[in-house]
Amino acid sequence: MRNSCKKARRTRPLKATIQALLVAIATMTFFFTSDIALPQSAAAYPFWAQQTYPETPREPTGRIVCANCHLAAKPAEVEVPQSVLPDTVFKAVVKIPYDTKLQQVAADGSKVGLNVGAVLMLPEGFKIAPEERIPEELKKEVGDVYFQPYKEGQDNVLLVGPLPGEQYQEIVFPVLSPNPTTDKNIHFGKYAIHLGANRGRGQIYPTGEKSNNNVFTASATGTITKIAKEEDEYGNVKYQVSIQTDSGKTVVDTIPAGPELIVSEGQAVKAGEALTNNPNVGGFGQDDTEIVLQDPNRVKWMIAFICLVMLAQLMLILKKKQVEKVQAAEMNF
């Protein structure tokens, strides 16, 4: 009996590890094959960061890991109240501005609109408010946006997206503040909030490979001897650029559908020189702000102190007028 219990204990962690690996492999397989087999819009997938960096989306340097795949820097902003009371619902507004007239390449090379995505790191204890706590007016601002935690049991780090950028250049998060009186791990004070937000597809896949939303360069120095156009079974067009080096060796660089070739046959190129334009019109941005979890008793005492100061000033004014009257009476006497 004891041996069976020991075996069960040993196999539980093994089963959990195998299950996690299978889920990760299935997820990555789905997204990579869907890019090839099922052409889709230019999307921003923040949960790729979740798969690659499962513990936290923020590096020790302070950089959000989405920047590893989204190489272009673009603005992003998060707005929150300066201070909030415990156990109250407030809104955090994430702004991801861009020119909606812009279009970029999808996985099949076609031009499509941009999607947006974001990761919002709230202080410990802060989380998305339950639906019954959200006011009706705030529900309208939030819309049909779905928020998910970055990690199971970590409700203060939130993922959202991909969402259509034309509709969601501003994303409203309904946030519930914690109550230190019921949670002893939470304390009143000032806390940091971190945002990472992107519009459009990344330039690098989590595997390190370039997406077709990137600049492709020559892998060797030499002369372009041939540019061959190929079409796969799905109708996606790509180019094979043959470069003959000075030693006579031929190197072939593959250019996927999307980027436009800026070279021609017979042209001399150097290693690292661009063979295509840069099709990327999106980018990633970070923003940091602070919020104060205010003690309501401190607010009450502050109001009482202000009232006391005002009362003291009033008494001084009355006393001054009284002294002036006495002095005037003595002068008349």
Swiss-Prot record:
Compartments, as annotated in UniProt: Cellular thylakoid membrane
Q: Which PROSITE patterns match?
A: CYTF (PS51010)
Cofactor binding note from Swiss-Prot or TrEMBL: Binds 1 heme group covalently.
Q: Which HAMAP family match?
A: Cytb6_f_cytF
Ranges annotated as spanning the membrane? 299-319
Query: Signal sequence: where?
Result: 1-37
Note the subunit structure.
The 4 large subunits of the cytochrome b6-f complex are cytochrome b6, subunit IV (17 kDa polypeptide, PetD), cytochrome f and the Rieske protein, while the 4 small subunits are PetG, PetL, PetM and PetN. The complex functions as a dimer.
User: What is the protein name stated in its UniProt record?
Assistant: Cytochrome f
Residues on the membrane's Lumenal, thylakoid side span: 320-333
- The gene name on file is petA
